[in-house]
Amino acid sequence: MLTLKIAVYIVVAFFVSLFIFGFLSSDPTRNPGRKDFE
């Protein structure tokens, strides 16, 4: 049961970080070719 909770926390943290990174990267310039993403 503990591993399930850890997996859920990892998935939630992954989606939250993905949303934050996407919002920050698309906020200043909306060009599809981002140079700072590497």
Curated annotation (Swiss-Prot):
Transmembrane parts of this sequence: 6-26
GO cellular component annotations of the record: photosystem II reaction center; plasma membrane-derived thylakoid membrane
Keyword terms of this UniProt record: Membrane, Photosynthesis, Photosystem II, Reaction center, Thylakoid, Transmembrane, Transmembrane helix
Presence of keyword S-adenosyl-L-methionine: no
Source taxon at top rank: Bacteria
Membrane topology: Single-pass membrane protein
Localization terms from the record: Cellular thylakoid membrane
GO biological processes: photosynthesis
Recorded family membership: Belongs to the PsbI family.
Function: One of the components of the core complex of photosystem II (PSII), required for its stability and/or assembly. PSII is a light-driven water:plastoquinone oxidoreductase that uses light energy to abstract electrons from H(2)O, generating O(2) and a proton gradient subsequently used for ATP formation. It consists of a core antenna complex that captures photons, and an electron transfer chain that converts photonic excitation into a charge separation.
Record HAMAP family: PSII_PsbI
NCBIfam families documented for this protein: PRK02655.1
PANTHER family, A to Z: PHOTOSYSTEM II REACTION CENTER PROTEIN I (PTHR35772:SF1)
Quaternary structure (record): PSII is composed of 1 copy each of membrane proteins PsbA, PsbB, PsbC, PsbD, PsbE, PsbF, PsbH, PsbI, PsbJ, PsbK, PsbL, PsbM, PsbT, PsbX, PsbY, PsbZ, Psb30/Ycf12, peripheral proteins PsbO, CyanoQ (PsbQ), PsbU, PsbV and a large number of cofactors. It forms dimeric complexes.
Protein's UniProt name: Photosystem II reaction center protein I
Gene: psbI
